[in-house]
């Protein structure tokens, strides 16, 4: 067991470049590929994640719908941005207005922006 503890300590002291080199050397020595093992291990996790319901959303402004002034006013009210920043956000669409918000809040923000004339999508 002392030998294993020493190996763990030695591996923990490696830099990222040294660890990558070690990985390549082990692949050559054992005749395996680390990337294949990672792909196989990640596949079941990806399937499980797709089944889960998304809980955080990004509110993305995709356009001003020809009502730029109303949309800028609404962006300022929602985000607290100054006039210049809000105008830049609207003119630079598609841009995120808020990121990582709950589903209810995202839906509420989408309705507010659409009422002002904006086109919005949730991601």
From Swiss-Prot:
One GO BP: translation
InterPro entries referenced in this protein's UniProt entry, alphabetically: Ribosomal_bL12, Ribosomal_bL12_C, Ribosomal_bL12_C/ClpS-like, Ribosomal_bL12_oligo, Ribosomal_bL12_oligo_N_sf
Signal peptide: none
Pfam family for this entry, one: Ribosomal_L12
Gene3D superfamilies: 3.30.1390.10, Single helix bin (1.20.5.710)
Keyword Transmembrane attached: no
GO cellular component, one term: cytosolic large ribosomal subunit
GO molecular function: mRNA binding; structural constituent of ribosome
Keyword Ribonucleoprotein among UniProt keywords: yes
Keywords: Ribonucleoprotein, Ribosomal protein
Domain of life the protein comes from: Bacteria
HAMAP family registered for this protein in UniProt: Ribosomal_bL12
Subunit text: Homodimer. Part of the ribosomal stalk of the 50S ribosomal subunit. Forms a multimeric L10(L12)X complex, where L10 forms an elongated spine to which 2 to 4 L12 dimers bind in a sequential fashion. Binds GTP-bound translation factors.
PANTHER family: 39S RIBOSOMAL PROTEIN L12, LARGE RIBOSOMAL SUBUNIT PROTEIN BL12M
Record's function text: Forms part of the ribosomal stalk which helps the ribosome interact with GTP-bound translation factors. Is thus essential for accurate translation.
Family listed: Belongs to the bacterial ribosomal protein bL12 family.
Protein name in UniProt: Large ribosomal subunit protein bL12
Provenance organism: Zymomonas mobilis subsp. mobilis (strain ATCC 31821 / ZM4 / CP4)
Gene coding for it: rplL
